[in-house]
């Protein structure tokens, strides 16, 4: 029987153990829970075979539905294909054509999960939306705003891909897994007798099931990708590449060169169709320029502040000085040079466990 005043929450269910336990925990806490999975697949991708069970595949939908049945909650599949194609897949391919390395998870969180899906939840009369991310939303009494903090499981922390959240999003967001470790989550799934309890994690890009992004780019934009030259930092031709979108900063393997010593991708030049390669020392940089910024609770970006800056998902944050150099642009100078700063990736700023905000890396210094 429904309890008067019960808060309603829409749980984004990917078919994995994390979102399954999120739904179970919130139900146990007394929320009225509705489960949804976002249908984001191109029909051509859906028929790739039963071996793929990653996030939001048709097999993941089946797992999410079984969990919802087990918990006794309503469950729906919502069609976000067109929006996902436009905001995530088109962005993904276009960034590579610009000589940059995209982060599709950040784009998905920004435009799909925490924008379109949250708006859908509110339109359906939900009070909150919840996901299985490992992070913690905390109300900061001293400033009257919400902050985002790392999850207690530092190995699983996902705040890096959540820096685009706004105050309006944070006040409607529940992240119950921020207080648990991954092993504790699996133990809870076994306790609740969920079919996803021992399901392995998906490591690939969700819309590139075999994780071969080069093949994906070739199928989508192959007519625009042409061979060109590998050059050193002085412009000397060292060989031929297969197309600059197939490479990323810091890459060593797969260059197809025999030069007697290791070479790494140092820069990508779309305008001349060149991939610059160099020795290990040449992929280190003192800092970067970032734009397209979002800070979770700053009214205005300070002219200058110190923070721990993280330049890729699994990187360790490094001490840096951040200087505002425009309305939507900052310069970040690290205490020590950093390896393989990559345009297109995110730089995210922390103070201790608190996420301050972040932006997109435009170039290295």
From Swiss-Prot:
This is tRNA-specific 2-thiouridylase MnmA. One of its GO terms (molecular function) is ATP binding. Keywords: ATP-binding, Cytoplasm, Disulfide bond, Nucleotide-binding, RNA-binding, Transferase, tRNA processing, tRNA-binding. Disulfide bonds join 108-206. It catalyses: S-sulfanyl-L-cysteinyl-[protein] + uridine(34) in tRNA + AH2 + ATP = 2-thiouridine(34) in tRNA + L-cysteinyl-[protein] + A + AMP + diphosphate + H(+). The keyword Disulfide bond applies. It comes from Carboxydothermus hydrogenoformans (strain ATCC BAA-161 / DSM 6008 / Z-2901). The record marks 133, 345 as: Interaction with tRNA. The gene is mnmA. It comes from the Bacteria. PANTHER family: MITOCHONDRIAL TRNA-SPECIFIC 2-THIOURIDYLASE 1, TRNA 5-METHYLAMINOMETHYL-2-THIOURIDYLATE -METHYLTRANSFERASE. Pfam families: tRNA_Me_trans, tRNA_Me_trans_C, tRNA_Me_trans_M. Its EC number is 2.8.1.13. GO terms for cellular component: cytoplasm.
